[in-house]
C-alpha cells in the first residue's frame, strides 16, 4: 500500500489537473447552472483593476469555473507542447488559478499569449521556451479589459486597441524579463512580475497622458468562511492522501528527515 509508485508524464499532468477539476465541480455545486453563464459573461465585461473580486462580480460558482477552466487550459498548453513537468508548471498553474479569481478571465489572457507566440515565431524558436513567461505575464491581462472600456470609441476600435496592446505586451515580455534579471541579479523571485510591473507603469502613464484615468476599485467578498474552510480542507486532505499513496514510505522518511534537520 505504501510502496512508491512510478508516475508517467501523463499521470503527473492528470494529477495536477485534478485541482482545477475539483474547483469546477465545486462551482457547479455552489451556484445554479442558470446563473453561472451570466456570471461568466459579467466577469468578462466588468473592469478588472484591483481589487475586483470575482466572487462578488459573477458569483462563487462562476469564479471557480473561470479559474478552473483557465488553469486546465494552461496545464493542457504545457502538456501539448511536450514539456516535462517541473516547479514552473505547478507554480504557473497555481498562480493562474489564484489570479483568475480576480483579474484574469476567459477573454483577456489570449492577446498576451498570442504576443508570446509571435515572439517565438519571430525568433524561430519553439513556443516552449517562452510559455512560462507568457503564463506569468498574463498578470497584465486586466489592462486588456480596461482598454475595452475606454470612452466613446466604437467597440471595434476598442477591441483592436486592446488586441494590439496585448500582443505588444506579450512580444515585449520575454526580452524585458531577460534584461531585468541583470538588474536584480536574481534577488527577485518574481522576475516576470518585475518586468510586468515596468510595462504596467508605462501603460498607465500613457493612458494618463491622454487624459484617461484609471480608477482603483474595492470589490471584496466577505463571509462564507466555513464554506471555504471546508472546500480547502477537503482539497488539502486529498493532496496529503495522494502524497502518501503515490510517494509511499519515502514521504514519511523525507518529512521526518526535514523535521530533524530543523530541530538541530
What is the role of each PLM region?
Residues 78-88, 103-109, 121-131, 181-188:
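Membrane-helix interface "capping/anchor" motifs
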Residues 143-165, 173-228:
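Membrane-interface helix-loop-helix junctions at boundaries between adjacent transmembrane segments
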Residues 16-31, 70-78, 95-99, 116-117, ...:
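Hydrophobic core segments of alpha-helical transmembrane domains in multi-pass membrane transport
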Residues 245-254:
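Membrane-interface capping segments at transmembrane-helix boundaries
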Residues 74-80, 96-104, 119-124, 142-148:
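Hydrophobic alpha-helical transmembrane segments
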Amino acid at each position: 500500500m505504501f510502496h512508491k509508485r512510478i508516475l508517467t508524464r501523463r499521470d503527473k499532468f492528470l494529477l495536477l489537473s485534478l485541482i482545477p477539476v475539483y474547483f469546477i465541480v465545486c462551482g457547479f455545486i455552489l451556484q445554479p447552472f442558470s446563473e453561472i453563464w451570466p456570471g461568466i459573461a459579467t466577469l468578462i465585461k466588468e473592469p478588472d483593476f484591483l481589487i475586483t473580486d470575482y466572487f462578488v462580480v459573477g458569483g462563487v460558482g462562476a469564479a471557480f469555473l473561470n479559474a478552473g477552466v483557465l488553469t486546465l487550459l494552461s496545464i493542457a498548453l504545457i502538456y501539448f507542447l511536450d514539456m516535462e513537468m517541473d516547479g514552473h508548471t505547478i507554480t504557473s498553474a497555481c498562480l493562474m488559478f489564484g489570479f483568475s479569481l480576480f483579474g484574469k478571465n476567459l477573454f483577456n489572457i489570449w492577446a498576451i499569449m498570442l504576443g508570446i507566440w509571435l515572439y517565438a515565431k519571430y525568433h524561430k524558436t519553439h513556443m516552449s521556451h517562452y510559455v512560462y513567461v507568457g503564463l506569468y505575464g498574463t498578470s497584465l491581462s486586466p489592462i486588456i479589459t480596461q482598454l475595452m472600456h475606454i470612452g466613446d470609441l466604437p467597440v471595434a476600435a476598442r477591441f483592436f486597441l486592446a488586441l494590439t496592446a496585448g500582443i505588444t505586451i506579450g512580444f515585449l515580455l520575454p526580452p524585458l524579463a531577460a534584461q531585468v534579471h541583470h538588474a536584480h541579479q536574481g534577488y527577485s523571485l518574481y522576475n516576470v512580475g518585475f518586468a510586468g510591473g515596468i510595462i504596467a507603469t508605462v501603460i498607465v502613464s500613457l493612458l494618463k497622458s491622454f487624459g484617461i484615468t484609471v480608477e482603483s476599485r474595492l470589490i471584496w467578498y466577505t463571509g462564507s468562511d466555513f464554506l471555504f474552510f471546508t472546500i480547502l480542507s477537503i482539497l488539502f486532505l486529498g493532496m496529503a492522501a495522494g502524497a502518501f499513496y503515490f510517494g509511499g514510505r519515502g514521504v514519511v522518511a523525507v518529512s521526518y528527515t526535514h523535521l530533524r534537520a530543523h530541530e538541530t
